[in-house]
Amino acid sequence: MAYRQSFYQFLMTLRDPDSNGDLAQFANNAQFDSTFPRQEQDRTRLSEYLEENAAYLPSMTIFDDAYQAYEEKMQY
């Protein structure tokens, strides 16, 4: 079975401190979230965590876009 990285590991590849883009800002902020579920892959669990704990995420649409990119990358 192929290795599947966690969503957090994928998200960290999107970090860019010089970018104002939504995905980069999400990644930059998640990096400093000490309670982010770093090993999680499940969309529902991640979504619930972010809805309850991530004041730094202005819209869940940003998470949806990031998770879609994650799923696409994990298919290859």
UniProtKB/Swiss-Prot annotation:
UniProt cross-references to SUPFAM superfamilies, sorted A to Z: YozE-like
Pfam family, one: YozE_SAM_like
Listed InterPro entries: UPF0346, YozE_SAM-like, YozE_SAM-like_sf
Matching NCBIfam families: PRK13672.1
HAMAP family to which the protein is assigned, alphabetical: UPF0346
Similarity annotation: Belongs to the UPF0346 family.
Entry protein name: UPF0346 protein Ldb1277
Organism: Lactobacillus delbrueckii subsp. bulgaricus (strain ATCC 11842 / DSM 20081 / BCRC 10696 / JCM 1002 / NBRC 13953 / NCIMB 11778 / NCTC 12712 / WDCM 00102 / Lb 14)
